[in-house]
């Protein structure tokens, strides 16, 4: 059976969801990406992360942020970007993701190499993500945005969270 999330129609829908507006631009390796700024709750320094057994390598574990347990995914590893050693600009972007199947929004942390800036992209700046032939999982992208001569890949954190943290995990972390 074919995964409907990988269909051309699903890709077109995701590209249409790359709304014009403000994006927090981040770096993973040498590449630049964008996260909708309205999803971002805060940016924190990299802190100790508690590993969770039987998780894939890109799920680094959980952190305790003011009494809430928050799952943390290393976006570098998730996107196949060679992850060098963590450094002074490596940080965790804490975002509010929408749970699948109409669940309540919850906090979700992603490790990034650096935060660049907040950029504004007009509708004309955003195009659908091209088909990379399986090299990149486009389910996690909402589009590509032009910024001068550069191109920023726009990330769908809701899709990443839905793929990484199963619904059962949300009940394991009440109040998160």
Each predicted region: which residue ranges?
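An acidic, low-aromatic, low-complexity terminal/linker signal
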Residues: 1-176
């Amino acid at each position: 059976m074919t995964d409907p999330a990988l269909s051309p129609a699903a890709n077109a829908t995701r590209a249409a969801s790359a709304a014009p507006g403000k994006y927090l631009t981040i770096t993973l390796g040498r590449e630049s990406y964008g996260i909708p700024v309205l999803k971002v709750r805060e940016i924190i320094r990299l802190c100790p992360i508690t590993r969770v057994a039987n998780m894939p390598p890109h799920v680094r574990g959980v952190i305790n942020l003011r009494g809430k347990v928050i799952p943390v995914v290393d976006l570098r590893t998730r996107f196949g970007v060679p992850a060098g050693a963590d450094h002074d600009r490596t940080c965790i972007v804490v975002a509010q993701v929408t749970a699948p199947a109409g669940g309540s929004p919850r906090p979700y942390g992603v490790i990034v190499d650096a935060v660049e800036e907040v950029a504004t992209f007009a509708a004309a700046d955003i195009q659908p993500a091209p088909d990379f032939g399986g090299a990149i999982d486009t389910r996690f992208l909402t589009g590509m945005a032009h910024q001068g001569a550069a191109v920023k890949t726009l990330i769908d954190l809701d899709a990443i969270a839905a793929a990484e943290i199963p619904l059962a995990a949300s009940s394991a972390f009440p109040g998160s």
